[in-house]
A protein has these predicted regions:
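Short conserved micro-motifs at the rims of enzyme active sites and ligand-binding pockets
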Residues: 14, 128-129, 183-186
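Low-complexity, glycine/alanine/valine/leucine- and proline-rich hydrophobic stretches
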Residues: 152-206
Length: 208
């Protein structure tokens, strides 16, 4: 009996191809299982994920589908730590993702999701070492904006919002009437602008 190396290589190739197809990617099923295991509010998780991904698509370069899917997973798992504590749920969520058995995920992938979950709130400077990666910075700001915009646990209307990305700068364009219509959300956006100060990136909110 001889080992058929060619067949193994072909099989591995098919596994890799399946892994990058949303319909057959085991990681999607794993994320759903983690949501169920830690009693995540599915409706809110999907609301935040949809908002984050919509903003991401506005600013991302063509061919960023993989980064968008990872953002979607991080958004769906952003409250996974609430099962442990509501006060520091972002920290607990990051710990869970760093220490869980998640089929289909490589350890660096899980760590990256954990970093996004950790960075969803609080100071951005704690992740400064990761912010040199423009794709990661975009994922992070989209997640943070989505969490802020969905603070009332309702789907925000972002149809007239536009997120732009330039070297070192993010610009969120909002309708001129929006701050008056949604004062709490406008306040959270102001806080978000402050959070990005003293980092390699600047967030501007522009009312047109």
């Amino acid at each position: 009996m001889q080992v058929a190396q060619g067949a193994l290589r072909q099989g591995a190739l098919y596994d890799l191809l399946d892994r990058e197809q949303p319909e057959t990617d085991l990681r999607t099923a794993t994320v759903n299982a983690l949501m169920q295991r830690f009693a995540v509010d599915t409706a809110h998780a999907e609301r935040v994920a949809a908002t984050a991904c919509a903003l991401f698509r506005q600013a991302a370069a063509p061919g960023s589908e993989r980064a968008e899917r990872k953002l979607e997973w991080a958004a769906k798992l952003h409250e996974v730590g609430c099962r442990i504590s509501h006060s520091d749920y972002h920290r607990h969520g990051a710990y869970i993702l760093d220490n869980t058995d998640a089929a289909g995920f490589a350890l660096p992938e899980l760590h990256r999701l954990g970093i996004l979950v950790l960075g969803q709130r609080g100071k951005v400077r704690k992740l400064e070492a990761d912010l040199s990666d423009a794709s990661f910075a975009l994922q992070l700001i989209c997640l943070r904006l989505a969490v802020a915009l969905c603070h009332a646990r309702r789907a925000p209307d972002i149809t007239e919002m536009q997120l732009l990305m330039e070297p070192g700068t993010f610009t969120l364009k909002i309708p001129s009437r929006w701050p008056q219509a949604f004062p709490q959300s406008a306040h959270l956006l102001q806080e978000e602008m402050v959070a990005w100060q003293k980092t390699p990136w600047e967030l501007r909110v522009q009312a047109d």
